[in-house]
Amino acid sequence: MNTNFERIKDWSDERLITQNEPDRNGFVSMIVEELGEFLEAKDNIEGRIDAMADIIVFAYGEIAKYGYHGDKVMDEVIKEISSRTGAYDPATKKWQKDKSPEAQARWYTANFTNCKL
C-alpha cells in the first residue's frame, strides 16, 4: 500500500502539478489561504481538520516539486526533533528546548541527502 506522501504525489503527478517548478510565493499563498479557512472555522473542528490536512497536502506536493520524498524528509525531521530535550512551558503553551551546550551536543541535524526521489 502506498504511503500518504506517495498517494498525494501520484494525485499531483496525474494533474501535472508536480511538473511545475517549485513556487515559493504560490506555496505561501496557498498556505495563507488555508490558514484563513482554519481561522474562519472557529468552533468547527472538522473545518479546522480539513484546513490542516490541506496544508499537509500542499506541503507534500511542494516537497515533491523540489525532488524529495516527503516521508523520508519527515523521518529525518522527526529524528531531529526527537534528539532534543526540554520541557513544556504552560505559561507560553510551548515546548521549550534545552539549549545548554550539553543538550546541543546531543542534537541530531536532519540530513536530507538520502531523501531524494
Regions found by a protein language model. Name each.
Residues 1-52, 56-117:
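Flexible "arm" and connector segments at domain edges
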